[in-house]
Amino acid sequence: MTEISLIEVYKIVDSFFKYFEGNFLVEHFARNYYGKRGFKRYLSMKDIMALNIYRFFMQFSNLKAFHRFANKYLKERYPNFPNYEKFLKATNKSFPMMMLFVNSVLAKNREKCAGETIHFIDSTPVEVCKNNKILRHKVARDCASRGKSTKGWFFGFKLHGVCTADMIVESLTFTTGSVHDSKMAQKLTKDIIGKAFADAGYQLKSEVLSEMADDGVFMHNAPGKNMNRLISKEQLDYIKQRNIIETVWSVMKGRFELVYTKARSLKGMFRHFFYSIAAFLISQSACRQKLFIPD
């Protein structure tokens, strides 16, 4: 993962806006951001998005701490830098556009990896609080749930994903913590073609496997406990390479601070998740300034 400057991040965001110029959703989100009433936006949506992505490269998991840093050291670039309250409101207003940005990057990744035939599927828990605070947690009480991973029980969400052998993420989706991995396999692989390798949690019924095979996706998963099933050496080798997508989760959580347990609102929580994911996607070699520039 290479370092990146604020200017580079801004160029990527700017190319995204130019690429989708005239798009109804983009124009709608932009109108909603600036609004007709309320306080004046001293920073454009491009600036807000670039700054919020950049803060994860600077490893500021706390938005207020990053605001203090930006207000002090980025004053030359942003002379009219808003106070924290206005910065927070502008950041929340940019959240719908950031969701569109992340989905657009994933779509571009799938385009660039169209020739790939090997894919890895996995999920990772995204805790919203520690287990001893579950009964007191209020922010995500109505949508988060208890789940169990290989490390034990947790309360929160699951992030399901697909990546290539080169760690290029092709698809991501959030579910509650109680959703079984196997229920997401078809949805995750609907836009890819080739062989998909997963752990024993992705045991699927033969009817589902047949439907996926008709769509060009051939699912291979590690055998569960007490299961006697023959698999080829090639399949076994690829199943053992599932640590590729586990490395993706490790980098997202360690380098880009995906897990966040101090959110004060559900919108603020998912805003943090999506900006963290956006920073990770940009950090990948396939996602530089030419991402939204036609070939």
List the predicted regions and their residue ranges:
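Short alpha-helical elements
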Residues: 1-295
